[in-house]
């Protein structure tokens, strides 16, 4: 018995293997049902929209209407939908779209802060300090230093009795100040500066041994060295050294006259010619101090004053007869002892420092304000 052919052998498509449905016509005859072939042409969009879109179950439902397309933005709108802020009369709010596609109003932006002023730095620190004042000229600074040194020197020698009672500490301080002044000498050629060198100079301190006898007399009781001076005449090339010693009874003055020759811009050679003794000036009245200091002991002079009171008339007559006498002049022999040299190491309008024969002389010009400190 022959086997029937397999079901799938003659069928070219699986759909052909299914039994063919039949459609009963009104005449009672049956005719085969054929599936309509799918058209290769797509239906119009309107027809597809009218027929609906099949869902996953094959049912068709009307599709949601698509929103109308928005027209292109005008040329004055940017890509974010914001109006041109420069357009006049634009009062509607500016809308923006966030990341979820929802419209919103942008947050107001704070205005940027103004640039800091020019005197503040970028870290907000203190303003830069003003520029320093212009430097003081070096000449002014040196002049102020000299004036201060001169005042210190006069204060140091005050009360030393021209150096006779100066202690070792005072002498050392004086030498230090003198050295500093000599280093800042404003007159490098003092002998040539005749307008400064000429005049009467008052001695305020000395370390010259030959003046010690005179200073010792001034340190004795009832005696005082009033003044030791040196007058320089650059026209006649002469020097006059004068000293005055006073007491309650009389005052005594003597001097020595010398000529000088210029040896260098700062050194002169002195040749003494004669000595002169002025007549003593007798006091018309004797005024003794209440007490004197002799070797550390105070001695009262009251009894001596009582003895001298009856003699006041006699002193007055003696003073009148002597005051008219000429000075006594004595020549000084021209030997080596009458010669000396004088080196001026500092000179200005007020102060002169000289060295000679191993001695130191500090002199202030007559009329200088420095004398008011003594």
Curated annotation (Swiss-Prot):
Please list which residues make up the signal peptide. none
Q: Which UniProt keywords are given for this protein, alphabetically ordered?
A: Chloroplast, Plastid, Transit peptide
Kindly give the Pfam families that the UniProt entry links to this protein: PAP_fibrillin
Q: What is its main location?
A: plastid
- Note the superkingdom of the native organism: Eukaryota
Q: Where is this region: Disordered?
A: 19-148
Chloroplast as UniProt keyword: yes
Show the ranges annotated as biased composition (Low complexity). 28-54
Q: Which cysteines link up through disulfide bonds? A: none
Localization in the cell: Plastid, Chloroplast
Stretches of Pro residues bias are at 64-73, 127-136
Q: Which GO terms describe its cellular component?
A: chloroplast
Q: Which InterPro entries match?
A: PAP (IPR039633), PAP/fibrillin_dom (IPR006843)
The organelle transit peptide extends over 1-46
What family is this?
Belongs to the PAP/fibrillin family.
Query: What's the name of the protein?
Result: Probable plastid-lipid-associated protein 3, chloroplastic
Name of the gene encoding the protein in the UniProt record: PAP3
């Amino acid at each position: 018995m022959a086997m029937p052919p397999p079901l799938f052998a003659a069928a070219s498509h699986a759909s052909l293997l299914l039994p063919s449905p039949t459609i009963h016509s009104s005449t009672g005859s049956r005719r085969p049902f054929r599936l309509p072939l799918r058209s290769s042409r797509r239906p119009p969009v309107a027809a597809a929209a009218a027929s609906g879109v099949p869902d996953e179950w094959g049912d068709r439902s009307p599709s949601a209407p698509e929103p109308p397309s928005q027209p292109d933005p005008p040329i004055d709108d940017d890509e974010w939908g914001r109006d041109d802020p420069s357009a006049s009369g634009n009062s509607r709010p500016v809308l923006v779209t966030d990341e979820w596609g929802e419209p919103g109003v942008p947050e107001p932006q704070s205005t940027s802060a103004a640039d800091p002023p020019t005197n503040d730095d970028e870290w907000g620190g203190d303003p830069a300090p003003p520029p320093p004042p212009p430097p003081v000229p070096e000449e002014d600074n040196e002049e102020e230093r000299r004036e201060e040194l001169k005042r210190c020197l006069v204060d140091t020698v005050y009360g030393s009795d021209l150096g006779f009672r100066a202690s070792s500490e005072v002498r050392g301080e004086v030498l230090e100040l003198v050295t500093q002044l000599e280093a800042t000498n404003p007159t490098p050629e003092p002998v040539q500066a005749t307008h400064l060198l000429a005049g009467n100079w008052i001695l305020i301190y000395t370390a010259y041994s030959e003046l010690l006898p005179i200073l010792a007399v001034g340190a004795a009781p009832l005696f005082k060295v009033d003044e030791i001076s040196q007058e320089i005449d650059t026209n006649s090339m002469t020097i006059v050294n004068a000293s005055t010693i006073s007491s309650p009874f009389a005052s005594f003055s003597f001097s020595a006259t010398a000529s000088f020759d210029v040896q260098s811009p700062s050194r002169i050679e002195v040749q003494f010619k004669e000595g002169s003794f002025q007549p003593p000036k007798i006091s018309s009245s004797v005024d003794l101090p209440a007490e004197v200091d002799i070797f550390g002991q105070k001695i009262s002079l009251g009894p001596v004053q009582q003895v001298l009171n009856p003699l006041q008339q006699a002193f007055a007559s003696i003073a009148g007869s002597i005051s008219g006498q000429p000075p006594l002049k004595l020549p000084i022999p021209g030997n080596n002892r009458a010669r000396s040299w004088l080196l001026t190491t500092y000179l200005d309008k007020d102060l002169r420092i000289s060295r000679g024969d191993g001695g130191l002389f500090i002199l202030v010009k007559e009329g200088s304000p420095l004398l008011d400190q003594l």
